[in-house]
Amino acid sequence: GSKCPFSDDTVAMVIVTRENRNRDFYTLQTLRNHDEFKKKAITRPVVFITHGFTSSATVESFVDLQTAILEXXXXKVTVSDWRVAACNRTTGLLYYVTAVSNTRLVGRYIATVTKKLVTDYNVSMADIRLIGHSLGAHVSGFAGKEVQKLKLEKYSEIIGLDPAGPSFESNDCAERLCKTDAHYVQIIHTSKKFGIEKSIGHVDFYVNQGNNQPGCGIIPLKDVCSHSRAITYMTECIKRECCLIGIPQSKSSKSISSCTRQECVCVGLKAKSYPNTGSFYVPVESTAPFCNNKGKII
């Protein structure tokens, strides 16, 4: 049998709200035990965060991201923890293939939870946003396809944090995260070795040309560090308005200081309020908080 099986019991929802940060684990069956799910309706926007291969919801970078979202936006965060199906007990890349095949199933699971939120708790699809890292970005895409099959509206937004490249780069839309999976799909590219290179969203941000993130040191850790840096960048962009500004790739010689709201786009939860779409180059500093805007807000 598979070393990293998928079943509904191997995926847990870690529900984090401003009032309750216990990071308790829930399944579809036990959701109703959470205070938030004892109510008739959930009135706050919901964010699903999904991790990648060999990871889990309790990794420090995800906890930082959850905290930033709770503090900056009045949202309710649901983290899909599929560590078993993501093979976090094994490191062999042999298991990557299994984790890849599990992404569609975990996506379907998130779609099922979404339907429950909409039908039982009066949540509007316009208030649901998905954020996924690596394989979790494709999980979010599959969830986006599934909710449409369930005859629900599209999700308002999917944010793909360095979506996994291996096994996905050459796939067509139906087999990976795609811009039709939500009303707005925002992608942050940070690693060519582990991340997808092609543009697959409404906006694709190529931080430091989408590879070798500054401050990530030497190979082989450089690639792993660059790949996970996408999570850190998003966290900083939630904490600090316009922390990272993207310049249209066709005008990459342009300076951040000459950026206007019409042309450039700020990475983060407000990206979709900017008119421009396409591929953007994002220069970046080499130390936290990595912001490139020098205090400028567009």
UniProtKB/Swiss-Prot annotation:
Compartments where found: Secreted
GO cellular component, one term: extracellular space
SUPFAM superfamilies: alpha/beta-Hydrolases (SSF53474)
S-S bridge residues: C4-C87, C173-C178, C216-C225, C242-C266, C243-C291, C259-C264
Gene3D superfamilies hit by this protein: alpha/beta hydrolase
EC number(s) stated in the UniProt entry for this protein: 3.1.1.32
Active site, UniProt feature: S134 (nucleophile), D162 (charge relay system), H227 (charge relay system)
Pfam families, per the entry: Lipase
Catalysed reactions, semicolon-separated: a 1,2-diacyl-sn-glycero-3-phosphocholine + H2O = a 2-acyl-sn-glycero-3-phosphocholine + a fatty acid + H(+)
GO molecular function annotation: phospholipase A1 activity
Known tissue expression: Expressed by the venom gland.
Biological process (GO), any one: killing of cells of another organism
Tagged with keyword Glycoprotein: yes
Glycan attachment residues as annotated in the record: N88, N122
Alphabetical UniProt keywords: Allergen, Cytolysis, Disulfide bond, Glycoprotein, Hemolysis, Hydrolase, Lipid degradation, Lipid metabolism, Secreted
Source organism, top-level taxon: Eukaryota
PANTHER family for this protein: LIPASE, LIPASE DOMAIN-CONTAINING PROTEIN-RELATED
Primary role: Catalyzes the hydrolysis of phosphatidylcholine with phospholipase A1 activity. May act as an allergen and induce hemolytic activity.
Family of the protein in this entry: Belongs to the AB hydrolase superfamily. Lipase family.
Official protein name in the record: Phospholipase A1
UniProt organism field: Vespula squamosa
